[in-house]
Curated annotation (Swiss-Prot):
The keyword Transit peptide applies. It comes from Rattus norvegicus (Rat). The record marks H382 as: Increases nucleophilicity of active site Cys. The keyword Hydrolase does not apply. Pfam families: Thiolase_C (PF02803), Thiolase_N (PF00108). PANTHER family: ACETYL-COA ACETYLTRANSFERASE, MITOCHONDRIAL (PTHR18919:SF156), ACETYL-COA C-ACYLTRANSFERASE (PTHR18919). The modification Phosphoserine is found at S204. This is Acetyl-CoA acetyltransferase, mitochondrial. Activated by potassium ions, but not sodium ions. The modification N6-acetyllysine is found at K63, K171, K178, K187, K199, K220, K227, K242, K248, K254, K260, K270, K335. Pathway: Lipid metabolism; fatty acid beta-oxidation. K(+) binds at Y216, A277, A278, A280, V378. SUPFAM superfamilies: Thiolase-like.
Length: 424
């Protein structure tokens, strides 16, 4: 009867207040208090990035994920039993077996009872995994989580359609192209979308080549100066009949001949094209992971945070304009955090193509000297499920105390994700 009275608006005020309090409590069923929890990164690591069919080709994505998860937990200095849940980004899952994140998690020795989820937001997958884990921690659903991304493009299979074999034989399709690098709406390669952006914003081949050479140069300088040392978890590879091989450095940035860059033919648009194999990112293997927890959990476990998650956002545009999508995610993040672009000490804009970074620098009107200061995917490599997590990992180590860093990555289908962190 009381419920009926509420529906008709005649219930007495004390009873109404009681019912509303119950509803408010139910609405906070995932939180122990009415405010959101602060979320911190207590460790951040990644594997070296292997070239396509290169040093890491023997390692499936799930194994790379295992190594990153293990490395993150070891660097955090916490028991594996403290990790309540794991999210990992992974894009091209064909042939990997069921539940790739579950495989990576159990391979890392976490308890059987640890829930696991694989996230696929194309190139933004690793970053989206971090964002989703942060949301779970903010609302109090969990207090310690691992998140990141993994990809082995060297191990992606070819497929053929099911059904009767047609006259003339069957056609094999490369899942790297079909599931990773093709705009399904316009039936064109991601590189053609990049060409569209170059034309729309009047970004020349010469500008893109210059940017790519700069990326390779900055990556080499950063490696020589030890800028990546703290974020790397080495990989030991067993070779039958030979000594183990330890991979502890990125492979891709060394594979460049600057004299050939301006001479390369364009790949996606033969006439008046601008995108080449040199000024685009490459196909690669690798994984990255962070240990995230609430500030209260960090105090309980007596661990020193690297950084805090300050804000994050997604954005979406026309699929063909996916290279521009970060320019729509970034303002959302700055608005949520109450910051201006001048407050950002370091920017990471994923280098899917050189034109992506040039376009977003132009649209956001940000200082190029603060963008990808240690190189990016053009020179380091772009394992697509890993890259969004990798740029967050790098900011967590590269920033100085009190500085803000903003990482953003575009993804196929017209999307982008962005994460703002503050170094602690």
């Amino acid at each position: 009867m009381a419920a009926l009275a509420v529906l008709h608006g005649v219930v007495r005020r004390p009873l109404l207040r009681g019912l509303l309090q119950e509803v408010r409590c139910l609405g906070r069923s995932y939180a122990s208090k009415p405010t959101l929890n602060d979320v911190v990164i207590v460790s951040a690591t990644r594997t070296p990035i292997g070239s396509f069919l290169g040093s890491l080709a023997s390692q499936p994505a799930t194994k790379l994920g295992t190594i990153a998860i293990q490395g993150a937990i070891e660097k955090a200095g916490i028991p594996k039993e403290e990790v309540k849940e794991v999210y990992m980004g992974n894009v091209i899952q064909g042939g990997e077996g069921q539940a790739p994140t579950r495989q990576a998690t159990l391979g890392a020795g976490l308890p059987i009872a640890t829930p696991c989820t694989t996230v696929n937001k194309v190139c933004a997958s690793g970053m989206k995994a971090i964002m989703m884990a942060s949301q779970s921690l903010m609302c109090g659903h969990q207090d310690v989580m691992v998140a990141g991304g993994m990809e082995s493009m060297s191990n992606v299979p070819y497929v053929m359609s099911r059904g009767a074999t047609p006259y003339g034989g069957v056609k094999l399709e490369d899942l790297i192209v079909k599931d990773g690098l093709t705009d399904v709406y316009n039936k064109i390669h991601m590189g053609n979308c990049a060409e569209n952006t170059a034309k729309k914003l009047s970004i020349s081949r010469e500008e893109q080549d210059k940017y790519a050479i700069g990326s390779y140069t900055r990556s080499k300088e950063a490696w020589d100066a030890g800028k990546f040392a703290n974020e790397i978890t080495p990989i030991t590879i067993s070779v039958k009949g030979k000594p183990d091989v330890v991979v502890k450095e990125d492979e891709e940035y060394k594979r460049v001949d600057f004299s050939k860059v301006p001479k390369l033919k364009t790949v996606f648009q033969k006439e008046n094209g601008t995108v080449t194999a040199a000024n685009a990112s490459t196909l690669n293997d690798g994984a990255a992971a962070v240990v995230l927890m609430t500030a209260e959990a960090a105090q309980r476990l007596k661990v020193k945070p690297l950084a805090r998650i300050a804000a994050f956002a997604d954005a979406a545009v026309d699929p063909i304009d996916f290279p521009l999508a970060p320019a729509y995610a970034v303002p959302k993040v700055l608005k949520y955090a109450g910051l201006k672009k001048e407050d950002i000490a370091m920017w990471e804009v994923n280098e899917a193509f050189s034109v992506v970074v040039l376009a977003n620098i132009k649209m956001l009107e940000i200082d190029p000297q603060k963008v990808n200061v240690h190189g990016g995917a053009v020179s380091l490599g772009h394992p697509i499920g890993m890259s969004g997590a990798r740029i967050v990992v790098h900011l967590a180590h590269a920033l100085k105390q009190g500085e803000f860093g903003l990482a953003s990555i575009c993804n196929g289908g017209g999307g982008a994700s962005a994460v703002l962190i503050e170094k602690l």
